Structure formats: structure tokens, C-alpha cells
Amino acid sequence: MFFEQLPQQLVNGIILGSIYALLALGYTMVYGIIKLINFAHGDIYMMGAFVGYYAINSLKMNFWIALVFSMIVCAILGAVIEFLAYRPLRNSTRISALITAIGVSFFLEYIMVYFVGADTRSFPQSIKMYTYHFGSISVTNVQLLILVVALVLMVALQLIVKKTKMGKAMRAVSVDSDAAELMGINVNNTISFTFALGSSLAGAAGVLIGLYYNSIEPLMGMTPGIKAFVAAVLGGIGIIPGAALGGFVIGILETLSTAIGLSSYRDAIVYGVLIVILLLRPAGILGKNVKEKV
């Protein structure tokens, strides 16, 4: 029975994993450039879902315009959070920045609870759903859309990082921010751009997950945010392809856990696999062990 369901569950896992991958990319970019775990990232994903919800429901935008609008709003939100919450603490201890990140996370969650309530809302289905059958595998047009959008955004991110002037600045700052500043790179602008870029991907993921599961609520970012962080660590935090790979691995693990009747333990299985991977490869699947000079 399990092997009959395996192809379908792999497809479902890849779709879910593509959303985790988008989220994980935000974590890994921010960590790569300033060594900060931005635990508010999952809540930016939640904000993206709500921006998409109101853009479609209240502003009567179509799905594609709402998706871009959500990405823009979340990019601005990410840059503002970096400027107000993280920049003043850049020379402080890492624990100070970590506590601030957790505080920003709770602030975003409960300000949304205050303004929109804690109830779950149905995300508007602005795209008519069709199902395609390929042998024993069933795939909807919405699933295909999610996968294609996620892959396009991942490729676009890679092109930005590798081919653009700002991308080169990001890589320079991640290696040595002091040397980058001496070379004329505006470190503050580069870090703000990194937050904005990662947050825009989180906003896109929020809209896609709303379309996929047809429901959103103010606390929806907590668990996916942690899983995306796990995905980033699993693949090798600070490494963009590693974060994407980790996202797909987490998505497939979750759906396979459900397929074998262990849906109640799927989170435990994900974290268990993370522990095993880190025991075997402490830097993650694609990470490299680097000795830190003291």
C-alpha cells in the first residue's frame, strides 16, 4: 500500500518542500551576511499571507498582482524591521539580537491578533482548480503553479546573488564586512537589501501556502518558520542551494511520514533526521566545516 502511494506522496512533498525552500532561503541569506537567526521570518510569511488575502478580497486584485504586491509589502517590512530592530544591535552580543528577533516575532503575531482577530480565515481561491492524472499520480494546476513560481523565484534569487552588483556586494559583506566597507560597499544598504529580498520570498510563500491550504491565521508562521530554519540548517545554513535542498527534504519527509500513518509524529521525525544529519555532517548536507579563528 505504501509503495503504491509513494509517487503521489513524493509529488506532494516536493510541492510542500518548495514553500519551505522559499522560507529557508530568507533564513540562510540573513545568517550568511550578519550571522543572525531571524526568528521573525516565519511571521513575515504570515504577514504576506494576510497581505495577499486583503489584496484579493478588498482591493480586488487578481492572484498574480496580489502575489507581487505581497512580495513588495513584505520586502519593505523586512527592511524596516532590520533598520529599527536589528541595526542598533549589530555590534551587540548575538544573544541580544536573538532575543530581539523573538520579540519581533511575538510583536507581529499579536498585533495581527489585535487587529484582525485570532480566527482562521478562508483564503480566496482566485484560481479555478483543475486536476491532471498521470497514471497513479494526481496533480492540480494549483500545485503546479506553486512549484513553478517557487522554482522561478529560486532561480531569480540565484541570478541576483551571482550576476548583479548588489549580489556581489552581498557576497563580499558575508565574507568580510569590514573589508567590503573599505572597498566602497555600503554595508548598511547591502544588509537592508538582503532582509528585503528574503522577506519578499517569505511573502510569496505566504500567498502560495494560503492558496494551497485555503486557510490563514495570525499564528500560522510559527511552526513553518521553525521548519524552514531546520531546512536551512539541514542543507547548510548560509548556503543558498543548501537551504533550497533542505526545504525539499523537509517537505518530502513530512508527506512520507503521513503516508505511513505517522502524521502525529511527523515533526519529531523531521527533527530526528536533522539530529542524525548534523551528527554525520555538522555543517549540513552542502556545508563545509570551517575552523573559526579566535
Describe the function of each predicted region.
Residues 89-163, 190, 256, 261, ...:
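Transmembrane helix-bundle core of multi-pass membrane transporters
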Residues 36-39, 74, 136, 171, ...:
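Glycine-rich phosphate-binding loops of nucleotide-dependent enzymes
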Residues 49-53, 71-77, 104-111, 149-158, ...:
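Hydrophobic core segments of alpha-helical transmembrane domains in multi-pass membrane transport
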Residues 16, 138-216, 240-246:
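Helix-loop-helix "hairpin" substructures at the membrane interface of multi-pass membrane proteins
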Residues 1-23, 51, 59-66, 92-96, ...:
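Membrane-interfacial amphipathic/re-entrant helices at transmembrane-helix boundaries
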Residues 60-104, 111, 245-250, 281-282:
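Alpha-helical transmembrane segments within multi-pass membrane transporters and channels
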Residues 20-22, 60-72, 192-202, 206-274:
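Transmembrane alpha-helical segments in multi-pass inner-membrane proteins
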Residues 11, 33-80, 84, 260:
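Membrane-embedded helix boundary and interhelical linker motif in transport proteins
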